[in-house]
Regions:
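Hydrophobic alpha-helical transmembrane segments
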Residues: 8-20, 36-45, 104-109, 129-138, ...
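Alpha-helical transmembrane segments
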Residues: 12-22, 99, 228-236
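Structural signal for the C-terminal ends of transmembrane alpha-helices
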Residues: 79-87, 146-153, 200-206, 275-282
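Transmembrane helix-loop junctions in multipass membrane proteins, especially transporters and channels
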Residues: 33, 86, 109-117, 156, ...
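Membrane-embedded catalytic cores of phosphoryl/pyrophosphoryl-handling enzymes
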Residues: 120-266
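Interfacial segments of alpha-helical transmembrane regions
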Residues: 8-16, 79-100
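N-terminal transmembrane-helix/juxtamembrane module of multi-pass inner/ER membrane proteins
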Residues: 1-73, 108-124, 257-264, 275-283
Length: 283
């Protein structure tokens, strides 16, 4: 039996996401071991960002989700939904994009508080109003909306590409030391909460055709193919880098063990959210 998101399950799931958002905030601001991990992961990203040629690329990618550039492409999922004759889906996407990004904008000053930085070296002080990350919210909300807007047969691929986009944006601004890693998770969860709320409302409406088109004809293992390929590709790239510069990679990994785990966790969370939505709306 294929998993399926319904209005009755979407709203509790949104509540769980909101609860995890609170837990993430509390841990990032009030639990010492999490704060130390936050700093260690950020230090690793910052050290990579200091290497030749990294900063220009990171600046370009990170700024894709700055307000002005974002407006140039954020509307694409809505346009796709309208062109596919799904005006309600287009409206839900508009609600997700506006609601998620506005929520993050309001939470930043409300929860602003300086965080300890005793483990950071060569990293400029990050502003108190950094949680949750607006760039992470924008990137993940766009990725999730792209999943909802895309044709059923393309949704697995769109989920993998959308997750890769969100990871690229977040890795980039972390390399530039704009945010703590916990800010990224906060942004992801804001986007997820709004997506679940909007999809729940969409599914609760009476309709003659599925609010979110079916992909039931695609076997689960085939639907997971693009996401699995993304994981394998990332692993293969890591192996190639390690083979090309074994001593440098091993030395860096040994001195940044928490960073390695944190970077992998961010990527897996992004992929899990996009892929999970893709599977959850299957009929």
């Amino acid at each position: 039996m294929h998993a399926r998101l319904t209005s009755k399950s979407a709203f509790p799931a949104a509540g769980v996401a909101a609860g995890l958002l609170f837990v993430t905030w509390f841990a990032a601001f009030h639990i010492g071991v999490v704060q130390r991990a936050d700093q260690s992961i950020l230090q690793g990203f910052s050290d990579i960002g200091q290497r030749n040629g990294i900063r220009p690329v990171a600046n370009f990618v990170a700024n894709l989700c700055s307000p002005e550039p974002y407006l140039y492409f954020a509307w694409i999922p809505m346009l796709v939904a309208v062109m596919r004759g799904r005006p309600r889906v287009a409206l839900a996407i508009a609600v997700i994009l506006l609601g998620a990004n506005l929520t993050t904008h309001l939470l930043k000053p409300l929860l602003a508080e300086p965080r300890p930085a005793w483990l950071l070296h060569g990293v400029a002080q990050i502003g108190a109003a950094s949680w949750p990350s607006g760039h992470a919210t924008a990137a993940m909300s766009f990725a999730l909306c792209a999943v909802l807007a895309s044709p059923a047969r393309l949704r697995p691929l769109v989920a993998a590409v959308g997750a890769a986009f969100a990871v690229a944006v977040c890795y980039s601004f972390l390399a530039l030391a704009w945010h703590y890693p916990s800010d990224v998770l906060g942004g992801f969860l804001v986007a997820t909460t709004w997506t679940l709320l909007a999809v729940g409302a969409l599914l609760a409406l009476p309709q003659r055709q599925p609010a979110v088109p079916s992909v039931s004809k695609t076997a689960t293992w085939r639907a997971l193919g693009p996401s699995a390929a993304a994981v394998i590709g990332a692993g293969g790239l890591a192996v190639l880098v390690a083979v090309a510069r074994p001593h440098a990679v091993v030395s860096f990994a040994r001195s940044h063990e928490v960073f390695v785990l944190g970077a992998a966790a961010i990527a897996l969370v992004a992929l899990a959210l996009a892929t999970g939505l893709m599977l959850a709306v299957r009929r």
